[in-house]
Regions:
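Short hydrophobic beta-strand element within catalytic cores of glycosyltransferases
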Residues: 192-195, 205
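Active-site proximal beta-strand in glycosyltransferases
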Residues: 2-20, 47
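Aromatic "clamp/platform" in nucleotide-sugar-dependent glycosyltransferases that forms part
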Residues: 156, 175
Length: 264
């Protein structure tokens, strides 16, 4: 395949590294090196969506010619609510108290156990879990066992912009990201995001200014949600408008591909 396409450029948007505890990250790293890295090393160039990922592939896995081309988001589709819109959307979704959205597929690195334990600490807050995946059944059973009446599993949704505008914060206690589109969508929607201080998330969020970066421990996550202010979301929106629109992302990608073409 690579002999047939000697100038092949690969785009990498998977997690690359997952920060599992108890040495789990090193097992993941070994698997990635065995299964993914050989193909990356044979490509003409590799594009990835965060500066951290580009540095990591080069430094840890010895991949050459890696270029960071950060993601963009549609800031017209994902926007803060207009006056009165949030209240109307809360009525549509039956939200009568503060609500937190968790937009993440049900896979191990998304750390839904921390979500459920955080919800247990905040019984006065509704948690809306959007996404499907191999662990959906497990987390449904866990929520029932924990008696979490404030947790809803919404599955796959086509109304994400409206859901963002209906809630008050977003929680993503992730253990592995490259560059999270859900984080960018939430920020563009003017929401405070509470997430973990893994490298790719720290590229998007400045703790205490455009969101919160806290360890994935339920008491810390719950406290950050209690303290989340609208100002975080306003500054997050301004950051995305300045650096991560679709137009900006397209221009970055076009410029990188043009440079690679000219270099031969």
């Amino acid at each position: 395949f690579f002999a047939r396409y000697p100038r092949l450029v690969l785009l990498v948007h998977d997690q690359i590294e997952v920060f599992y505890p108890l040495g789990g990250r090193y097992l993941y790293r070994l698997g990635y090196r065995l299964l993914q890295v050989p193909n990356l090393r044979r490509a003409r160039a590799v594009l990835t969506v965060s500066r951290w990922a580009a540095r990591w592939l080069e430094r840890v896995h010895g991949v050459k010619g890696v270029h960071a081309v950060p993601n963009g988001v549609d800031v017209e589709r994902f926007r803060p609510p207009l006056p009165g819109e949030k209240e109307a959307l809360k009525g549509r979704y039956g939200l009568k108290r503060p609500a937190v959205l968790v937009p993440a597929r049900m896979s191990p690195e998304k750390n839904h156990l921390a979500v459920l334990l955080t919800a247990r600490l905040l019984p006065q807050v509704d948690f809306l879990l959007v996404g499907t995946g191999e662990l959906l059944g497990l987390w449904r059973r866990a929520a029932r066992l924990l008696g979490l009446e404030n947790v809803r599993f919404l599955g796959r949704r086509e109304d994400m912009p409206e859901l963002y505008r209906a809630v008050d914060a977003v929680l993503l206690p992730t253990l592995g990201e490259n560059q999270s589109l859900a984080t960018l969508e939430a920020m563009a929607s003017g929401l405070p995001v509470v997430t973990t201080p893994i490298p790719a998330q720290a590229e998007l969020i400045q703790d205490g200014l455009t969101g919160r970066l806290v360890p994935p421990w339920p008491p810390r996550l719950a406290q950050a949600l209690r303290e989340a202010s609208p100002g975080l979301g306003k500054r997050a929106r301004a950051f995305v408008e300045a650096t991560h629109t679709l137009d900006q992302a397209a221009r970055r990608l076009a410029a990188t591909l043009k440079r690679l073409w000219e270099e031969g």
